[in-house]
Structures are given as structure tokens and as C-alpha cells.
UniProtKB/Swiss-Prot annotation:
The lineage of its organism: Bacteria, Pseudomonadati, Pseudomonadota, Gammaproteobacteria, Alteromonadales. SUPFAM superfamilies: MurCD N-terminal domain (SSF51984), MurD-like peptide ligases, catalytic domain (SSF53623), MurD-like peptide ligases, peptide-binding domain (SSF53244). Pfam families: Mur_ligase_C (PF02875), Mur_ligase_M (PF08245), MurD-like_N (PF21799). Cell wall formation. Catalyzes the addition of glutamate to the nucleotide precursor UDP-N-acetylmuramoyl-L-alanine (UMA). The gene is murD. This is UDP-N-acetylmuramoylalanine--D-glutamate ligase. Its EC number is 6.3.2.9.
């Protein structure tokens, strides 16, 4: 039985009318299936005219907005949910029939892809931190070495956009990618079980999204559910919590120590730290644009995944320096004051901030100091893991936001402010040439900003503002 046979004449409900939900809508419509789209928001579209346009363009879709429709959900045979919807806290789980199939868009893609004569190959990446950097680096390497790759999932375009009606059943898609590089969040993994990836990696694990997953053990199990869905597991030797439940045919590891055969690591050669594949020297980390040991791990994870897919190791290594990183991830901010300003606004959890500090402190020279700006919405995280590093490696802590006071309590001399602009102004008064000011909040941005991107942009603007306009 093909996936389409299983979907025919079924009550299908798409939960959420955001980017993911609308990609599901377009795909189901292209297969000539009838379905409903349910969103608790009264108006998920930009305006009524846009909603009317969708209703006209997709006549087999029933749109129900303003609440989670009990009668619709309780009679569903198949529910396709958007990853941002918490089925438990929204009260949806209690409405779902016992035999209802609950999946996400990535699972739907995999069901379709698996049924094709020539399925698209997949590389999958998850983890608390660094996954966007790793998949973007993989995509950059693929382009440089001539591999036709698509970036999808939690980054890039919705994964169902890779499929089209006229070629779902064909052995080849029009402009079919050689490989799909998919970034997966824990929310997407909750509804994913049918992926057949060449290789997958859980980069690291730290407290995150515990407001939804409740316990670290549950979060860990969800993340590691990626491994049974891959032939090769790419695991970090630096983060045991990320690989305790590995179930794969083959394992390739990466870490900061000297590697074993067919694994990746670092070794000191002629007073330089060199990236190694077994006994083979690849490149000195000094030659790479992304600083810090956490980024060395990201580079090695990408190389291991690409190697798993059969890509030339020498060709990948030659092109590592061409990837300049992503905005808001340990991004250097240009300034005229000879202070090192680092925008790490994407550090929305404790683990990301720990990684940033641990990776950047070794780059400071002499008596140069590290000033950290942190705080925001911690989403119920335990900040105690920051205590040692804040007291040993951070010379001045500046906090703000909903949970700023809790972070400030971990040291004796923190400065607490109300706005990010004030935080930058305080840092400007303290920092001297050569010092580093790091925005790495260890928290989400939703208490003060629309998203982490806006937070990072406001940090950059405040850093680059002239002295007189900052007061």
C-alpha cells in the first residue's frame, strides 16, 4: 500500500496555517485530496483578502479558524501538525482518536520519498546548538564541490516544497537534488519515524524547550530518536549525553582529542591545532574563519556527515574557509573602538552560551577581558551550569530581561539593566581596546523582542551607534 492509498478517503486535518501548514496544504491539494486546515488564531493570514484567495485557490480545503475544532480533530484519521504547536498544552492530545495517525511535514515527506523508485538521499542534523551552522556549512560545501543539495526542515524552505504533483511518482524529480540536508528540531522529531537517512547527528544536548518536553531525559530521548532512522551515526565524543542511545549500523565520531582511525579530531602539530581524520592531517584550525573550539566541532561534524555521503574529504577541506558563518551566531560586529564585539543572539539556551564562552576565551590574549551580556526568557531552564564559567572566565556580567536577575545571582558583581541598549552602553564604559563584549543571552528573546534576529540586530545597532547618540 502506497502512502497515497493510505491517505485516500480519509479525514485529514492540518493543524496550523503558518509556513509549514501552508506547505502541507499545497502538497495535499496537488494530490487531489480533501482535507481541513485548523488554526486557533482568528486570522492566521495577513488579511481577509488573502484568506479568500486561499479559499478560492484550494476548494477541497476546509478552513476552520479561531479555535481548535473539537469535532474536526476527534473525527480525524490523519493529523498533520506544525512543529510549533504543543499538542499537550493546547489540549489537542485529549481530542485525538486512538487510531489517528499524527505526523509532521517531514514525516509526510519521508513517506512519499520512501515510496518513490529513486528516493532522494538525506543527511539529518539535530542538537541543542550549532545545527543551523552545520547544515549551512554542509550546503556550502556541497555547492563548492558540485553536489546538487537542498537545505530544508527547520531551516530554508519547507521540505514538502521539494515535491511536486507531476513528479511525486516518477523515478526522478525535475531538478531533483542529489541529497537533502535536513535540520531537525526536537518538535519535528516528535512526529518523525520513517526517515531513511545516510547519516544523522545529534551535535550536543543541553537544557532547552523543557517548558514543552518537561524533563531532560524526555528531551534526550526525542533527540536521539534520529539515530535509528540513519545508516551512520555521527556522534560527538565531547557530549556523552547526545550519544547514549545510538542505534545505527555504523558510527563515526568527532571530538577535540586525537581521533581513532576513520574518525575526526584535533592534534597539536608544530604548535598548531590541526584537524585530523585518523592519522591524516586536514587543516589547521587557525586557517578557518569561525573561531572557537565549539566551531571546530561544527566543522568536524560537517566533514563527518559529508564523508558519510561519499563526498571527497580533500575537496571539502579545501572549501571550508569559504564558509563565513551565519548571522547572530558568534558573529563579529564591525566597530571603530578596537573592542571585540560578538553577536551570539542565537544562543537561546544555557548550552549555547557555555559553548560560546568556552570557545572564545582561548582567543583572548594577555590581560584582555570578557564582558558578557545575558538574559531573557529562560523557558524554565536551570542556569546553575553557568556558575563556574561566569565566576572563572567572565570578567563582568551584565544581565537583562525576564530571567536576568536569576542569572545575575550567580555572581557577586553583576550589573542589571532594563534594555539591551543600556547593556551595550554599560559595556562601552567598561571595555578597553582588545577586550571582548559577548552578547550570548542563554535565553530566548520573546520577553523583549520579536525573535533572536531582532535582538541581534538591535545589539549591532547599539554597538555601532556613535557615543553621543547612545546616551
Amino acid at each position: 500500500m502506497t502512502w497515497l492509498t493510505a491517505f485516500k478517503d480519509k479525514n485529514i486535518v492540518v493543524l496550523g496555517a503558518g509556513m509549514t501548514g501552508l506547505s502541507c496544504l499545497r502538497f495535499l491539494h496537488a494530490q487531489d485530496l480533501s482535507f481541513a486546515v485548523n488554526d486557533s488564531r482568528p486570522m492566521p493570514f495577513a488579511n481577509r483578502d488573502e484568506q479568500t484567495q486561499y479559499e478560492n485557490d484550494y476548494p477541497k480545503a476546509k478552513f476552520v479558524f479561531g479555535q481548535w475544532q473539537q469535532s474536526l480533530i476527534s473525527s480525524a484519521d490523519i493529523i498533520i501538525t506544525s512543529p510549533g504547536i504543543d499538542l499537550v498544552s493546547e489540549g489537542i492530545t485529549a481530542l485525538i482518536p486512538e487510531n489517528c495517525l499524527v505526523i509532521g511535514d517531514v514525516e509526510l515527506f519521508c513517506l512519499v520519498n520512501n515510496s518513490r523508485i529513486s528516493p532522494m538521499k538525506m543527511l539529518a542534523v539535530t542538537g541543542s546548538n550549532g545545527k543551523s551552522t552545520v547544515v549551512s556549512l554542509l550546503a556550502s560545501l556541497a555547492k563548492a564541490i558540485g553536489v546538487n543539495a537542498a537545505l530544508a526542515g527547520n531551516i530554508g524552505e519547507p521540505i514538502l516544497n521539494l515535491l511536486h504533483r507531476e513528479n511525486v511518482y516518477n523515478s526522478q524529480l525535475a531538478n531533483q537534488p542529489d541529497i537533502v540536508i535536513v535540520e531537525l528540531s526536537s518538535f519535528q522529531l516528535e512526529t518523525l519515524s520513517s526517515m531513511h537517512a545516510i547519516a544523522a547527528s545529534v551535535l550536543n544536548l543541553s537544557d532547552d524547550h523543557l517548558d514543552r518536553h518537561k524533563t531532560l531525559a524526555n528531551y534526550q530521548a526525542i533527540k536521539q530518536s534520529i539515530y535509528p532512522q540513519a545508516k551512520i551515526a555521527v556522534v560527538s565524543r565531547e557530549d556523552q549525553a547526545s550519544n547514549t542511545l545510538v542505534a545505527a549500523q555504523e558510527i563515526i565520531s568527532f571530538g577535540l582529542n586525537k581521533p581513532e582511525q576513520d574518525c575526526f579530531g584535533l592534534q597539536a602539530i608544530d604548535n598548531k591545532m590541526v584537524m585530523m581524520f585518523g592519522e591524516q592531517a586536514l587543516i589547521s584550525i587557525d586557517e578557518l574563519p569561525l573561531a572557537g573550539m565549539h566551531n571546530a566541532l561544527n566543522y568536524m561534524a560537517a566533514l563527518a556527515l559529508g564523508y558519510s555521503a561519499g563526498w571527497s574529504l580533500s575537496a571539502m577541506t579545501e572549501n571550508l574557509a569559504g564558509f563565513m558563518g551565519l548571522a547572530h551566531r558568534c558573529q563579529r560586529v564591525a566597530s571603530e573602538d578596537y573592542i571585540q564585539w560578538i553577536n551570539d543572539s542565537k544562543a537561546t539556551n544555557v548550552g549555547a552560551t557555555l559553548a560560546a564562552i568556552t570557545g572564545l576565551v582561548p582567543t583572548l590574549t594577555g590581560q584582555n577581558k570578557l564582558i558578557l551580556i545575558a538574559g531573557g526568557d529562560g523557558k524554565g531552564a536551570d542556569f546553575s551550569a553557568l556558575t563556574t564559567i561566569l565566576n572563572c572566565d567572565v570578567n563582568q556580567l551584565i544581565t537583562l530581561g525576564k530571567d536576568g536577575a536569576e542569572i545575575a545571582s550567580l555572581v557577586s558583581d553583576a550589573i542589571q539593566v532594563d534594555t539591551l541598549r543600556e547593556a551595550v552602553e554599560q559595556a562601552k564604559q567598561i571595555a578597553k581596546p582588545g577586550d571582548m563584549v559577548l552578547l550570548s543571552p542563554a535565553c530566548a528573546s520573546i520577553d523583549m523582542f520579536k525573535n533572536y534576529q531582532v535582538r541581534g540586530e538591535q545589539f549591532i545597532a547599539a554597538v555601532q551607534a556613535k557615543e553621543d547618540s547612545c546616551r
